[in-house]
A protein has these predicted regions:
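A short, compositionally biased
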Residues: 3-12, 144
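Extracytoplasmic
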Residues: 6-8, 15, 38, 81-83, ...
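Solvent-exposed coil/turn segments that connect beta secondary-structure elements
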Residues: 7-9, 23-25, 46-48, 89-91, ...
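Short, surface-exposed loop motifs enriched in S/T, G, D/E and P with embedded aromatic residues
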Residues: 15-23, 41-45
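Exported/periplasmic cell-wall-interacting domains
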Residues: 53-152
Length: 152
């Protein structure tokens, strides 16, 4: 099971612990809140196998771009989703599944981030950001439909 600890800004899986960055708006489930959802989830989809480190994704598809500081400057303000995506789906109807609280419909992912993104401090708009090498390691070890617990 993947365990994400929002206050500690960590993700743990099979004896490994990684620094992450969750929402700068804190925990929450409502659609449009830009918060990181809590509770039981699963990895509904794994996206990006075989893509290079820093591959850029838009709407879960690789753009063919590879993130660089120069590309970052050209697209200031872009929410960078890089390298790999683990798309989460809630398992608790009314809390993080269905209706106005559906994690999957909110497009909440565990994903790679630019090297300039600070880990260990909230900074995302809902997703769980990781270092690119860390998300590749996690992606390769996590099976589809793996359980995920997000605690606040």
């Amino acid at each position: 099971m993947i365990v994400i600890d929002i206050p500690a800004q960590t993700l743990a899986f099979e004896g490994r612990s990684y620094l992450v960055s969750t929402s700068k708006k804190g925990p929450g489930e409502k659609n449009g809140s830009l918060c990181t959802p809590r509770g039981r989830h699963i990895v509904r989809a794994k996206i990006g196998a075989g893509q290079p480190l820093n591959a850029v994704f838009v709407r879960r598809r690789p753009t063919g771009e590879v993130w660089t500081p120069e590309l970052h400057e050209e697209h200031a303000g872009r929410d960078w989703i890089l390298t790999r995506i683990l798309w989460l789906s809630g398992c608790e109807p009314g809390r993080n599944r269905l209706g106005e609280v559906d994690t999957m419909r909110r497009y909440i992912y565990i994903h790679g981030s630019p090297d300039t993104a600070e880990m260990g401090k909230p900074g995302s708009i809902g997703c769980i950001r990781m270092r690119n090498r860390d998300i590749v390691e996690l992606f390769d070890r996590v099976p589809p439909y793996a359980p995920v617990q997000i605690n606040a």
